[in-house]
Amino acid sequence: MSDLLCSAKLGATTLALLLSAASLSAQASVTPDRTRLIFNESDKSISVTLRNNDPKLPYLAQSWIEDEKGNKISSPLTVLPPVQRIDSMMNGQVKVQGMPDINKLPADRESLFYFNVREIPPKSNKANTLQIALQTRIKLFWRPKSLENVSMKNPWQY
């Protein structure tokens, strides 16, 4: 009888742990429209659409660029506007702009940067509330003109 009782307790404990772990998942409210960005040298800028998927609340979206080491930069690429309000279920747009220093990037290979978006939730009216600002980080590739028209028939040859 005690083995049956232990087995039932173990099953109930396992179920409780699984249910609590499932409730800990987080989903960003402000999301970019793609998973990576390619900035061609021939482009002056590229636009990224940010979507607020929250059905009720507006969010602030803070955007910036980092280099391959994770350092925040403002040149040779920058984001405009760096902060914007996006109402619920609406889109916002940011522009990744090339600066004059962009000519100093290598012309024989792509350069890696990271595009970041942090969602900032509105202040809660309730006392003792924990609010979390989630951040999305996606790769941003700067592609020089020498690689823009490379055929993707045999990409391993380049």
Where do the PLM segments sit?
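Short acidic, flexible loop segments centered on an aromatic residue
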Residues: P55-N71
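N-terminal signal peptide c-region/cleavage motif recognized by signal peptidases
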Residues: S20-S25
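Extracytoplasmic
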Residues: D43-S45, P58, N91, E110-L112, ...
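Terminal connector regions
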Residues: D101-L147, S151
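Bacterial N-terminal signal peptides that target proteins for export
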Residues: M1-T14
